Amino acid sequence: KRVRARRCRKVRGLDFCGYCAAKKEKFFGWRLHLICTPQGRPVSYTLLAGRYQDLAPIHELTFVLPPGVTVYGDKGYVSADDAASILADTGVRLIAARRTNMEPNEWHDEMNLKRYRKTIETVNSQMEKMGLQRLHARTNEGFEIKVHASLFALSLANL
């Protein structure tokens, strides 16, 4: 939450003030964008300031994936233009959950999206249980090290 945002010395400015639509609240800090395998092991991730939208880091995250892979995302990753450019640049298909007023995905993509949604939510809850939202680091480098350690622990937990 943004209660202590003015007192924070590690990060300053409006770049770190974001809005979480799922929780319908504002927050101050970072967003973690994570790509996992169907077994829940992290493959690629990036930390982004809270202000920026979900589609900003998706090109960077998909460059490490082999061509022909399909990435499933939530409603924040809905963009036909970005999905087409990612497919052209890296050969990775981006399938995002559609909003109610949009044309639905193909039936097999919807079926796979529902199947992998449980894995996505499980990984998110595991990260919350590890205390990722309450990391108390003195420097930004220390914060990044703690995020690395949490993701390493997650990959070991999901072997």
List the predicted regions and their residue ranges.
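Short, solvent-exposed polar/charged micro-motifs at secondary-structure junctions
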Residues: 1-5, 105-107, 146-148
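Polybasic low-complexity intrinsically disordered regions
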Residues: 1-90, 98-99, 151
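Structural motif
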Residues: 22-25, 137-147
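Hydrophobic (often cysteine-bearing) scaffold residues that line and stabilize catalytic clefts
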Residues: 54, 116, 148
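Helix-centered, glycine/charged polyanion-binding patches within enzymatic domains
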Residues: 70, 75-141
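Charge-patterned, long linear interaction tracts outside catalytic cores
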Residues: 150-159
